[in-house]
Amino acid sequence: MATVDIEKVLETCLLAGKIMLESDAEMYRVEDTMSRIALASGDYRLVSYVTQTGLFVGLDGTSTIRMVQILNRSINLEKVSNINQLSREYVMGDYTLDELLTKLKELEQERKFFPLWLRFISAAVVSGTIMILFGGVWSDLFLTCLIGGLGYILYYSSLKVLRIKFLSEFLAAFFIGCAALLSSQLGLGINQDMIIIGCVMPLVPGVQMTNALRDLLAGHYLSGVSRGTEAMMTASMIGFAIAFVFQLFY
């Protein structure tokens, strides 16, 4: 295979890994996807080093190494699924390397996010159902849905302005705590504890915790510890905010 083809193989693998990392995919999945693409491109063995903030790839037997920095990360499981599907189709011979690279570039440019109103409804449904599951009363359902939805919208909106994830989580949890306690004191809510528990659930880093454990079990200790630390920081910000609210009200 010519040098230009080797460069294109590396570019394709690097782009696939970059999109997956930015979409918060597990490290083992990123490495496996890139390895399969390289293997299907000419029986190459890919050598990679993957972290949450950087990606290094090379082909065994060559001197070329490529790297990319990961600056922005968000949960986008749809992109992860799309890249998995594209890699499977490429391995089966449905696409050429050029076609796969083109489709990956198109996927990278996609900015498909759920509209704000749908995010509000989703957060509201999660908040309300969790509140009921944890033993809350049905009369608090509407209030929990409303506060939970508004709290998540505050988190999402403040993140765009502040660009600091942990501060946005603190502000959202602080709003949830204040709204729940005020509603309870005004007689609008009955069980303030269950309302708060339900409302903060959309902020809880469940995906990060799961991926951290999966990376640790797969032997990716660096990424597993860093993901776990990030999840613990998020949980701490939520806890600090609620504790601060209780300190203010009582």
What are these regions (language model features)?
Residues 72-127, 131-140, 227-238, 250:
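Alpha-helical transmembrane segments and their cytosolic membrane-interface
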Residues 103-107, 151-162, 210-222:
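C-terminal ends of transmembrane helices
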Residues 1-95:
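Soluble N-terminal domains of membrane-associated systems
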Residues 112-186:
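Core alpha-helical transmembrane segments of integral membrane proteins
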Residues 185-250:
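Generic detector of multi-pass transmembrane helix bundles and their immediately adjacent loops
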Residues 18, 22, 39-43, 88, ...:
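Generic secondary-structure signature for well-ordered alpha-helical cores
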